[in-house]
Amino acid sequence: MMIGKLWRSVGTVGKFDGRYDGVRTMVGKASNRAGVHVTDTVLFEETSFEFSPSLTPELNEFPMPSLDVITPQAYLTPLGSQSINHAKFLQIPWRQFVFTKPLGLSKSTKLDEAVTLIENSSSSPSNLSTPEAYTDLLHACISAKSLHHGIKICSLILNNPSLRHNPKLLSKLITLFSVCRRLDLARKIFDDVTDSSLLTEKVWAAMAIGYSRNGSPRDALIVYVDMLCSFIEPGNFSISVALKACVDLKDLRVGRGIHAQIVKRKEKVDQVVYNVLLKLYMESGLFDDARKVFDGMSERNVVTWNSLISVLSKKVRVHEMFNLFRKMQEEMIGFSWATLTTILPACSRVAALLTGKEIHAQILKSKEKPDVPLLNSLMDMYGKCGEVEYSRRVFDVMLTKDLASWNIMLNCYAINGNIEEVINLFEWMIESGVAPDGITFVALLSGCSDTGLTEYGLSLFERMKTEFRVSPALEHYACLVDILGRAGKIKEAVKVIETMPFKPSASIWGSLLNSCRLHGNVSVGEIAAKELFVLEPHNPGNYVMVSNIYADAKMWDNVDKIREMMKQRGVKKEAGCSWVQVKDKIQIFVAGGGYEFRNSDEYKKVWTELQEAIEKSGYSPNTSVVLHDVDEETKANWVCGHSERLATTYSLIHTGEGVPIRITKNLRVCADCHSWMKIVSQVTRRVIVLRDTKRFHHFVDGICSCKDYW
């Protein structure tokens, strides 16, 4: 079927839903014939996909030549005028004219001159009326996104019989109009082509990328399939465009079909295609398939490595990510600052301080000056590994600081409980003329909440509105509720919730529920829990917290009711998980697990010695944290199997004497483990840094930085 008939049968652009289903069926059959597995049901991640210009520049803009070459003085008028000497300019190659920057002329003025010149020469044969000349001028219009000039050039091309049948010019016109957000004009150029031989792969690709560029990936994919129906062999660029559309649509089925076409191709597949295919599988959560594509690539550039590392970082597959980074170094791949900026947040998430320091060493060894985002990530990594002093060192040596730099440093102090440093840095920030924003005040207010600085926190909330003109957002009200609730001012916290200009979120009710846990307020806690069960019916943390409130009040029947409610709703308590980095490996421990380690002779020896030492210091298990109706001995054994205790014992065995122990946990630390950690830090003379979901706990010589307030 001819392409014109295909499109006319569809009607208005954008009404392609039915045809898209046909596309999926067609490509799916093709993939099955090629032996590429197709699944009808795939669990997709909700993460949106943004294409990086550095990954696939062809998918966003056609590469543009530089416009910054200075015009030779010989081609200006002898009197020094800024106008162009047309007689002399007709003698120079066209490319040197279009991509030349006459002294004192803006790019807009330069395009005006160029278009005027080519309009004047269009009526007579000259070296300015060639396809090459128009191609270069269209390049300039695309670069400047100049629709006004583009329409003039389009008119000249379409009225010139020797130019309007040039596929390269057609593709450039389509690109120009799509870049200028005029898909209607791009589509008209495409549809008005009556000679199918002019619809080359580049023209089809230009139309497809036009749709993709303007947020219509489904239409881009339909153009690609129509091209196949017209017996046009897709090239690497067209395949890249189609795969990008699959990524945007999260359509793995069609993507696998295109993968099948790639497998059958005899031509060499370039890295751009593989990079997009890699992204498709990674964004679909199919990391094993993505790794197969990666391992099967004959050539891999830094973009390819960065793509895989980035997704592994986002999905918290940290061990694989670290191994890939080391392999990248072994293969002498020159990583960019973007690589390190991607890895550092992963180090932050699992408190991988050793790997973070390794990256810092790479930065120091490099001759290239690190950019601000990289230093911000480095600062954040140290803060979230509990090394706030190193964060401050990085902050102090930064020659250029943006607002994010100040906010990160404030947050590093806040999460580590250094409220005095938070206040001092904030005052310095104001004196330096840096205007705070909403993120600044989240760090400040959360720091006040964690350290019990109630009055200062309340005054800061007012200053935010009156002095700094920052309108409080929902997260600021959540901090305010937390500040009041933790101080025992439950009624005031409830009043804030009732009068604030936002509908209370789960974080608001969660803050209130935690305050009720701290102060044993059952009645208000039940109100908060009721709201949370509606907003987050499958969040086990809410059920556990209200169970703790009932358990502390010895209301065991209510504890049983909560447990039964969880069973009926299919809610399971999230398993406690802790991890530590020892040497270059991340060790993960799950509550009640680690049987092989717990049955080892080294564990039994250290654990026995440790328990004897802490019992002599007066420790006895607080079994109230166990909400099951079992005997006290069983409860004590369960508490001893909590993941942070396993991680601590492992670190005592496998690290040198005096080396700080750093643990990250996926849940809030329980009261008994908190007491246990304090005594362990005292009897072993070790600094223990535990980061739970709420804050940092620095245990030093039997004292915690949170002052038992968390």
Curated annotation (Swiss-Prot):
GO biological process: chloroplast RNA modification; cytidine to uridine editing
Region (Type DYW motif): 616-710
The keyword Repeat belongs to this UniProt entry's keyword annotation: yes
Ranges for the PPR repeats: 166-196, 200-234, 235-269, 270-304, 305-331, 336-370, 371-401, 402-436, 437-467, 473-503
GO molecular function annotations of the record: mRNA binding; zinc ion binding
Region feature (Type E motif): 508-583
Type E(+) motif, as annotated region: 584-615
Example of a GO cellular component annotation carried by this entry: chloroplast
Keyword Repeat included in the entry's annotation: yes
Assigned keywords, A-Z: Repeat
InterPro entries (UniProt xref): DYW_dom (IPR032867), E_motif (IPR046848), Pentatricopeptide_rpt (IPR002885), PPR_At4g14850-like_plant (IPR046960), TPR-like_helical_dom_sf (IPR011990)
NCBIfam families: PPR
Family: Belongs to the PPR family. PCMP-H subfamily.
Name of the molecule in the record: Pentatricopeptide repeat-containing protein At3g14330
Biological source species: Arabidopsis thaliana
